[in-house]
Curated annotation (Swiss-Prot):
InterPro entries named in the record: Amidohydro-rel, DHOase, DHOase/Allantoinase_Hydrolase, Dihydroorotase_CS, Metal-dep_hydrolase_composite, Metal_Hydrolase
Enzyme class: hydrolase
Pathway stated in the Swiss-Prot or TrEMBL entry: Pyrimidine metabolism; UMP biosynthesis via de novo pathway; (S)-dihydroorotate from bicarbonate: step 3/3
Native source species: Lactococcus lactis subsp. lactis (strain IL1403) (Streptococcus lactis)
The name this protein goes by in its record: Dihydroorotase
Example of a GO MF term: dihydroorotase activity
Free-text cofactor note: Binds 2 Zn(2+) ions per subunit.
Organism lineage: Bacteria, Bacillati, Bacillota, Bacilli, Lactobacillales
Amino acid sequence: MTLLIKNGRLVDPKSNRDEVLDILIENDKIVKIGLNLSVENAEIVDARGLVVAPGLIDVHVHFREPGQTHKETIHSGAKSAAAGGFTRVVMMANTKPILSTPKVLTETLEIADKEDIKIDAVGSITQDFDGEHLTDFDELIKAGAIGFSDDGIPLTDAGVLRKALQKAKLTDSLISIHEEDPNLIGTLGVNDGEVAHKCGFTGAPTVSEYSMMARDSMIAYETGARLHIQHLSAGESVEVVRFAKNLGAKITAEVTPQHFSITEQMIFEQGTNAKLNPPLRSTTDIGKIIEGLKDGTIDVIATDHAPHTREEKNVSLDKAPSGMIGLETSLQLGLTNLVAKGHLTLSELLTKMTVNPAKLYNFDAGYLAENGPADLVIFDAENDYQVGETFDSKATNSPFIKQKVQGQVKYTICDGKIVYQAK
Protein backbone atom coordinates (compact mmCIF):
# COMPACT_ATOMS: atom_id res chain seq x y z
CA MET A 1 0.00 0.00 0.00
CA THR A 2 1.24 3.48 -0.89
CA LEU A 3 0.07 6.45 1.17
CA LEU A 4 1.02 10.08 0.60
CA ILE A 5 0.40 12.60 3.37
CA LYS A 6 0.39 16.09 1.91
CA ASN A 7 1.02 19.52 3.43
CA GLY A 8 0.94 18.55 7.09
CA ARG A 9 2.88 20.21 9.89
CA LEU A 10 5.38 17.50 10.73
CA VAL A 11 6.30 17.63 14.42
CA ASP A 12 8.94 15.07 15.34
CA PRO A 13 10.38 15.61 18.83
CA LYS A 14 13.23 13.16 18.36
CA SER A 15 14.76 15.17 15.51
CA ASN A 16 13.42 18.55 16.68
CA ARG A 17 11.72 18.88 13.33
CA ASP A 18 8.71 21.21 13.01
CA GLU A 19 7.87 22.17 9.44
CA VAL A 20 5.30 21.69 6.70
CA LEU A 21 6.29 18.63 4.64
CA ASP A 22 4.91 15.66 2.73
CA ILE A 23 5.40 12.07 3.86
CA LEU A 24 5.43 9.10 1.50
CA ILE A 25 4.65 5.70 2.97
CA GLU A 26 5.05 2.35 1.27
CA ASN A 27 3.79 -0.70 3.13
CA ASP A 28 4.95 -0.33 6.76
CA LYS A 29 7.78 2.17 6.24
CA ILE A 30 8.21 5.89 5.66
CA VAL A 31 10.23 6.03 2.44
CA LYS A 32 10.44 9.78 1.79
CA ILE A 33 9.93 13.05 3.65
CA GLY A 34 10.12 16.26 1.65
CA LEU A 35 8.40 19.08 -0.21
CA ASN A 36 6.03 18.66 -3.14
CA LEU A 37 6.18 14.89 -3.24
CA SER A 38 4.07 13.07 -5.81
CA VAL A 39 3.66 9.45 -6.84
CA GLU A 40 1.23 7.63 -9.08
CA ASN A 41 -1.54 5.49 -7.59
CA ALA A 42 -0.95 6.64 -4.01
CA GLU A 43 -3.80 7.21 -1.60
CA ILE A 44 -3.67 10.90 -0.67
CA VAL A 45 -4.28 12.23 2.84
CA ASP A 46 -4.68 16.00 2.86
CA ALA A 47 -3.14 17.15 6.15
CA ARG A 48 -3.22 20.87 5.43
CA GLY A 49 -3.68 22.75 8.71
CA LEU A 50 -3.09 19.57 10.72
CA VAL A 51 -0.23 18.23 12.83
CA VAL A 52 1.47 15.04 11.68
CA ALA A 53 3.30 13.37 14.58
CA PRO A 54 4.66 9.97 15.58
CA GLY A 55 1.97 7.54 16.67
CA LEU A 56 1.31 7.91 20.39
CA ILE A 57 2.49 5.22 22.80
CA ASP A 58 0.70 4.37 26.05
CA VAL A 59 2.68 2.24 28.50
CA HIS A 60 -0.23 1.71 30.90
CA VAL A 61 -3.59 0.30 29.81
CA HIS A 62 -6.06 -2.26 31.13
CA PHE A 63 -7.89 -4.11 28.35
CA ARG A 64 -9.55 -6.57 30.77
CA GLU A 65 -9.11 -9.64 28.59
CA PRO A 66 -9.07 -12.43 29.65
CA GLY A 67 -11.72 -12.66 32.33
CA GLN A 68 -13.43 -9.27 32.42
CA THR A 69 -14.63 -8.76 28.88
CA HIS A 70 -17.88 -7.23 30.11
CA LYS A 71 -15.74 -4.14 30.85
CA GLU A 72 -13.49 -4.11 27.77
CA THR A 73 -11.98 -6.51 25.25
CA ILE A 74 -8.63 -6.35 23.56
CA HIS A 75 -10.48 -5.49 20.35
CA SER A 76 -12.54 -2.65 21.84
CA GLY A 77 -9.48 -1.40 23.70
CA ALA A 78 -7.47 -1.37 20.48
CA LYS A 79 -10.24 0.57 18.73
CA SER A 80 -10.25 3.09 21.58
CA ALA A 81 -6.48 3.44 21.35
CA ALA A 82 -6.59 4.05 17.60
CA ALA A 83 -9.32 6.65 18.06
CA GLY A 84 -7.05 8.45 20.51
CA GLY A 85 -4.07 8.47 18.17
CA PHE A 86 -2.21 5.58 19.80
CA THR A 87 -0.37 3.07 17.63
CA ARG A 88 1.21 1.11 20.47
CA VAL A 89 0.07 0.24 23.99
CA VAL A 90 1.28 -1.88 26.89
CA MET A 91 -1.32 -3.96 28.74
CA MET A 92 -1.06 -4.51 32.47
CA ALA A 93 -1.17 -7.96 34.04
CA ASN A 94 -4.28 -7.67 36.25
CA THR A 95 -6.52 -9.81 34.07
CA LYS A 96 -8.39 -12.94 35.19
CA PRO A 97 -6.34 -15.10 35.22
CA ILE A 98 -3.42 -12.79 35.94
CA LEU A 99 -0.57 -12.74 33.43
CA SER A 100 1.65 -14.79 35.74
CA THR A 101 2.37 -17.79 33.52
CA PRO A 102 3.76 -18.17 30.00
CA LYS A 103 0.59 -20.00 28.93
CA VAL A 104 -1.82 -17.20 29.88
CA LEU A 105 0.51 -14.53 28.53
CA THR A 106 1.00 -16.33 25.21
CA GLU A 107 -2.73 -16.84 24.73
CA THR A 108 -3.41 -13.18 25.50
CA LEU A 109 -0.75 -11.92 23.11
CA GLU A 110 -2.08 -14.19 20.36
CA ILE A 111 -5.40 -12.36 20.62
CA ALA A 112 -3.64 -8.99 20.69
CA ASP A 113 -1.60 -9.80 17.58
CA LYS A 114 -4.80 -9.80 15.51
CA GLU A 115 -5.44 -6.09 16.11
CA ASP A 116 -4.57 -3.17 13.85
CA ILE A 117 -2.32 -1.49 16.42
CA LYS A 118 0.71 -2.88 18.24
CA ILE A 119 -0.12 -4.33 21.64
CA ASP A 120 2.45 -5.50 24.18
CA ALA A 121 2.03 -6.78 27.72
CA VAL A 122 3.88 -7.00 31.00
CA GLY A 123 3.95 -10.09 33.15
CA SER A 124 3.16 -9.93 36.83
CA ILE A 125 5.98 -9.49 39.33
CA THR A 126 4.51 -11.95 41.81
CA GLN A 127 2.50 -15.10 41.25
CA ASP A 128 -1.16 -14.16 40.93
CA PHE A 129 -0.33 -10.87 42.67
CA ASP A 130 0.30 -12.65 45.97
CA GLY A 131 3.00 -10.11 46.83
CA GLU A 132 5.34 -12.85 48.03
CA HIS A 133 6.52 -15.27 45.35
CA LEU A 134 8.21 -13.99 42.20
CA THR A 135 7.09 -15.25 38.82
CA ASP A 136 9.55 -16.88 36.44
CA PHE A 137 10.86 -13.75 34.74
CA ASP A 138 12.95 -15.66 32.20
CA GLU A 139 10.05 -17.81 31.01
CA LEU A 140 7.67 -14.85 30.84
CA ILE A 141 10.19 -12.91 28.75
CA LYS A 142 10.40 -15.88 26.37
CA ALA A 143 6.60 -15.82 26.15
CA GLY A 144 6.63 -12.14 25.20
CA ALA A 145 6.60 -10.10 28.41
CA ILE A 146 8.36 -6.76 27.89
CA GLY A 147 8.51 -5.91 31.59
CA PHE A 148 6.87 -6.67 34.92
CA SER A 149 4.23 -5.03 37.10
CA ASP A 150 1.68 -5.89 39.76
CA ASP A 151 -0.14 -2.66 38.91
CA GLY A 152 -3.33 -2.23 40.88
CA ILE A 153 -1.70 -3.72 43.96
CA PRO A 154 1.40 -2.25 45.64
CA LEU A 155 4.32 -4.43 46.70
CA THR A 156 4.24 -3.90 50.45
CA ASP A 157 7.17 -6.25 51.15
CA ALA A 158 10.41 -4.35 50.52
CA GLY A 159 12.36 -7.60 50.40
CA VAL A 160 10.21 -8.93 47.56
CA LEU A 161 10.70 -5.73 45.58
CA ARG A 162 14.46 -5.91 46.14
CA LYS A 163 14.57 -9.48 44.84
CA ALA A 164 12.45 -8.49 41.84
CA LEU A 165 14.76 -5.60 41.00
CA GLN A 166 17.85 -7.77 41.39
CA LYS A 167 16.33 -10.34 39.07
CA ALA A 168 15.17 -7.75 36.55
CA LYS A 169 18.62 -6.19 36.38
CA LEU A 170 20.05 -9.42 34.99
CA THR A 171 17.92 -9.03 31.84
CA ASP A 172 17.66 -5.22 31.91
CA SER A 173 13.92 -5.62 32.39
CA LEU A 174 11.75 -2.75 33.58
CA ILE A 175 9.85 -3.06 36.85
CA SER A 176 6.79 -0.79 37.05
CA ILE A 177 5.29 -0.08 40.44
CA HIS A 178 1.93 1.09 41.82
CA GLU A 179 2.83 3.17 44.87
CA GLU A 180 0.12 3.25 47.57
CA ASP A 181 0.78 1.91 51.05
CA PRO A 182 -2.49 0.24 52.14
CA ASN A 183 -1.50 0.58 55.80
CA LEU A 184 -1.92 4.35 55.49
CA ILE A 185 -5.20 4.35 53.54
CA GLY A 186 -8.80 4.35 54.68
CA THR A 187 -10.95 4.29 51.54
CA LEU A 188 -9.14 3.87 48.23
CA GLY A 189 -9.80 6.15 45.29
CA VAL A 190 -10.54 9.38 47.15
CA ASN A 191 -7.98 11.86 48.45
CA ASP A 192 -7.88 12.17 52.22
CA GLY A 193 -9.02 15.75 52.05
CA GLU A 194 -12.13 17.87 51.79
CA VAL A 195 -14.15 15.47 49.65
CA ALA A 196 -13.51 12.40 51.79
CA HIS A 197 -14.22 14.31 54.97
CA LYS A 198 -17.51 15.66 53.62
CA CYS A 199 -18.44 12.11 52.68
CA GLY A 200 -17.65 10.96 56.20
CA PHE A 201 -14.71 8.66 55.64
CA THR A 202 -10.92 8.61 55.65
CA GLY A 203 -9.41 8.58 52.17
CA ALA A 204 -5.97 7.97 50.69
CA PRO A 205 -3.44 10.57 51.94
CA THR A 206 -0.53 11.68 49.80
CA VAL A 207 1.93 10.19 52.30
CA SER A 208 0.68 6.72 51.35
CA GLU A 209 2.16 7.36 47.91
CA TYR A 210 5.36 9.29 48.47
CA SER A 211 6.52 7.28 51.49
CA MET A 212 6.39 4.02 49.56
CA MET A 213 7.91 5.72 46.54
CA ALA A 214 10.84 6.94 48.65
CA ARG A 215 11.45 3.42 49.94
CA ASP A 216 11.30 1.84 46.50
CA SER A 217 13.44 4.51 44.86
CA MET A 218 16.22 3.86 47.35
CA ILE A 219 16.00 0.11 46.78
CA ALA A 220 16.28 0.77 43.05
CA TYR A 221 19.30 2.97 43.73
CA GLU A 222 20.95 0.21 45.77
CA THR A 223 20.31 -2.51 43.18
CA GLY A 224 21.09 -0.40 40.10
CA ALA A 225 17.97 -1.76 38.42
CA ARG A 226 15.48 0.23 36.36
CA LEU A 227 12.29 1.22 38.20
CA HIS A 228 9.29 2.96 36.67
CA ILE A 229 6.91 4.83 38.96
CA GLN A 230 3.35 4.53 37.72
CA HIS A 231 0.69 7.26 37.82
CA LEU A 232 2.16 9.53 40.51
CA SER A 233 -0.37 12.00 41.89
CA ALA A 234 1.18 13.94 44.78
CA GLY A 235 3.39 16.99 44.71
CA GLU A 236 5.78 15.40 47.20
CA SER A 237 6.09 12.41 44.87
CA VAL A 238 7.59 14.68 42.24
CA GLU A 239 10.19 15.76 44.80
CA VAL A 240 11.00 12.13 45.60
CA VAL A 241 11.56 11.28 41.94
CA ARG A 242 13.69 14.39 41.47
CA PHE A 243 15.83 13.48 44.49
CA ALA A 244 16.25 9.86 43.38
CA LYS A 245 17.26 10.88 39.87
CA ASN A 246 19.78 13.38 41.18
CA LEU A 247 21.22 10.67 43.40
CA GLY A 248 21.75 8.46 40.36
CA ALA A 249 18.89 5.99 40.66
CA LYS A 250 17.58 4.62 37.35
CA ILE A 251 14.11 5.98 37.97
CA THR A 252 11.46 7.03 35.47
CA ALA A 253 7.99 8.31 36.27
CA GLU A 254 4.63 8.71 34.60
CA VAL A 255 1.59 10.85 35.25
CA THR A 256 -1.91 10.51 33.85
CA PRO A 257 -3.77 13.37 32.13
CA GLN A 258 -6.44 13.30 34.83
CA HIS A 259 -3.87 13.98 37.52
CA PHE A 260 -2.67 17.18 35.84
CA SER A 261 -6.14 18.27 34.68
CA ILE A 262 -8.69 17.97 37.49
CA THR A 263 -8.81 17.93 41.29
CA GLU A 264 -10.66 15.91 43.90
CA GLN A 265 -13.50 18.45 43.60
CA MET A 266 -14.53 16.68 40.39
CA ILE A 267 -16.05 13.94 42.54
CA PHE A 268 -18.79 16.39 43.52
CA GLU A 269 -19.61 16.80 39.81
CA GLN A 270 -18.89 13.37 38.33
CA GLY A 271 -19.27 11.05 41.30
CA THR A 272 -17.71 7.62 41.00
CA ASN A 273 -16.36 8.30 37.50
CA ALA A 274 -13.82 10.53 39.25
CA LYS A 275 -12.81 7.83 41.73
CA LEU A 276 -9.29 6.68 40.86
CA ASN A 277 -6.28 4.88 42.31
CA PRO A 278 -4.30 6.94 43.15
CA PRO A 279 -6.97 9.57 43.71
CA LEU A 280 -7.34 13.00 42.26
CA ARG A 281 -5.56 15.49 44.50
CA SER A 282 -5.40 19.28 45.02
CA THR A 283 -4.52 22.28 42.88
CA THR A 284 -1.20 22.44 44.75
CA ASP A 285 -0.40 18.89 43.66
CA ILE A 286 -1.30 19.72 40.06
CA GLY A 287 1.05 22.70 40.15
CA LYS A 288 3.96 20.56 41.33
CA ILE A 289 3.15 17.86 38.76
CA ILE A 290 3.23 20.45 35.98
CA GLU A 291 6.61 21.67 37.24
CA GLY A 292 7.80 18.07 37.14
CA LEU A 293 6.63 17.74 33.55
CA LYS A 294 8.33 20.98 32.60
CA ASP A 295 11.73 20.18 34.12
CA GLY A 296 11.80 16.56 32.98
CA THR A 297 11.36 14.94 36.38
CA ILE A 298 8.25 13.25 35.00
CA ASP A 299 9.19 11.39 31.83
CA VAL A 300 5.96 9.96 30.49
CA ILE A 301 2.26 10.69 30.16
CA ALA A 302 0.22 7.47 30.33
CA THR A 303 -3.53 6.98 30.59
CA ASP A 304 -4.04 4.12 33.06
CA HIS A 305 -7.06 3.35 30.84
CA ALA A 306 -9.29 1.42 33.27
CA PRO A 307 -12.76 0.53 31.95
CA HIS A 308 -15.71 -0.36 34.18
CA THR A 309 -19.39 -0.82 33.36
CA ARG A 310 -22.11 1.69 34.24
CA GLU A 311 -23.59 -0.82 36.66
CA GLU A 312 -20.29 -1.24 38.48
CA LYS A 313 -19.83 2.51 38.80
CA ASN A 314 -23.46 3.24 39.69
CA VAL A 315 -23.06 2.46 43.39
CA SER A 316 -21.96 4.45 46.42
CA LEU A 317 -18.58 6.17 46.35
CA ASP A 318 -17.01 3.89 48.93
CA LYS A 319 -18.10 0.72 47.08
CA ALA A 320 -17.47 1.69 43.44
CA PRO A 321 -14.36 0.38 41.65
CA SER A 322 -11.63 2.91 40.95
CA GLY A 323 -10.55 3.88 37.46
CA MET A 324 -11.55 5.71 34.28
CA ILE A 325 -11.08 5.30 30.56
CA GLY A 326 -8.56 7.67 29.04
CA LEU A 327 -7.26 6.68 25.63
CA GLU A 328 -9.68 8.90 23.70
CA THR A 329 -9.10 12.04 25.78
CA SER A 330 -5.39 11.85 26.60
CA LEU A 331 -3.94 13.91 23.76
CA GLN A 332 -6.74 16.44 24.08
CA LEU A 333 -6.14 16.97 27.80
CA GLY A 334 -2.45 17.48 27.15
CA LEU A 335 -3.18 20.05 24.46
CA THR A 336 -5.82 21.77 26.61
CA ASN A 337 -4.12 21.85 29.99
CA LEU A 338 -0.42 21.86 29.12
CA VAL A 339 0.17 23.30 25.64
CA ALA A 340 -2.65 25.85 25.41
CA LYS A 341 -1.78 27.16 28.89
CA GLY A 342 1.89 27.56 28.00
CA HIS A 343 3.31 24.92 30.32
CA LEU A 344 4.76 22.74 27.54
CA THR A 345 5.39 23.22 23.85
CA LEU A 346 3.67 20.83 21.47
CA SER A 347 6.99 19.07 20.90
CA GLU A 348 7.55 18.69 24.65
CA LEU A 349 4.08 17.19 25.09
CA LEU A 350 4.65 14.76 22.25
CA THR A 351 8.04 13.77 23.69
CA LYS A 352 6.27 12.46 26.79
CA MET A 353 3.75 10.56 24.65
CA THR A 354 6.10 9.16 21.98
CA VAL A 355 9.89 9.38 22.41
CA ASN A 356 10.10 8.72 26.14
CA PRO A 357 7.58 5.84 26.26
CA ALA A 358 9.49 4.20 23.40
CA LYS A 359 12.75 4.54 25.36
CA LEU A 360 11.32 2.69 28.35
CA TYR A 361 10.97 -0.51 26.35
CA ASN A 362 13.45 0.12 23.52
CA PHE A 363 10.64 0.21 20.96
CA ASP A 364 11.52 1.13 17.39
CA ALA A 365 8.81 3.76 17.56
CA GLY A 366 8.09 7.33 18.58
CA TYR A 367 9.77 9.11 15.67
CA LEU A 368 9.25 10.09 12.02
CA ALA A 369 12.16 9.42 9.66
CA GLU A 370 12.89 7.92 6.29
CA ASN A 371 13.16 4.14 6.60
CA GLY A 372 11.43 4.40 9.96
CA PRO A 373 8.14 2.81 11.02
CA ALA A 374 4.98 4.20 9.41
CA ASP A 375 3.17 4.79 12.71
CA LEU A 376 1.62 8.27 12.80
CA VAL A 377 -1.16 10.37 14.22
CA ILE A 378 -2.67 13.32 12.35
CA PHE A 379 -4.64 15.78 14.44
CA ASP A 380 -6.11 19.24 14.58
CA ALA A 381 -4.29 20.82 17.51
CA GLU A 382 -6.63 23.77 17.91
CA ASN A 383 -10.16 22.51 17.26
CA ASP A 384 -12.38 22.82 20.34
CA TYR A 385 -15.14 20.31 20.98
CA GLN A 386 -17.18 18.78 23.76
CA VAL A 387 -16.31 15.25 24.84
CA GLY A 388 -19.21 13.00 23.87
CA GLU A 389 -21.05 10.38 25.89
CA THR A 390 -20.03 7.46 23.67
CA PHE A 391 -16.57 6.12 22.92
CA ASP A 392 -14.89 3.50 20.78
CA SER A 393 -14.10 1.87 24.10
CA LYS A 394 -16.73 -0.52 25.39
CA ALA A 395 -16.89 1.60 28.54
CA THR A 396 -17.98 5.18 29.23
CA ASN A 397 -16.57 5.79 32.72
CA SER A 398 -14.94 9.16 32.08
CA PRO A 399 -15.22 12.29 34.23
CA PHE A 400 -14.57 14.38 31.11
CA ILE A 401 -17.89 13.71 29.39
CA LYS A 402 -19.40 17.04 28.26
CA GLN A 403 -16.14 18.84 29.08
CA LYS A 404 -14.75 21.20 26.44
CA VAL A 405 -11.30 20.19 25.22
CA GLN A 406 -8.88 21.22 22.51
CA GLY A 407 -7.57 18.98 19.76
CA GLN A 408 -9.12 16.29 17.60
CA VAL A 409 -7.57 13.18 16.09
CA LYS A 410 -8.28 12.97 12.36
CA TYR A 411 -6.24 9.92 11.33
CA THR A 412 -4.25 7.20 13.03
CA ILE A 413 -1.88 5.21 10.83
CA CYS A 414 -0.17 2.03 12.01
CA ASP A 415 2.21 -0.01 9.86
CA GLY A 416 1.24 2.20 6.93
CA LYS A 417 -2.49 1.47 7.21
CA ILE A 418 -5.20 3.92 8.21
CA VAL A 419 -6.60 2.31 11.36
CA TYR A 420 -8.75 5.26 12.42
CA GLN A 421 -10.34 8.10 10.49
CA ALA A 422 -12.57 10.70 12.10
CA LYS A 423 -16.13 10.72 10.83
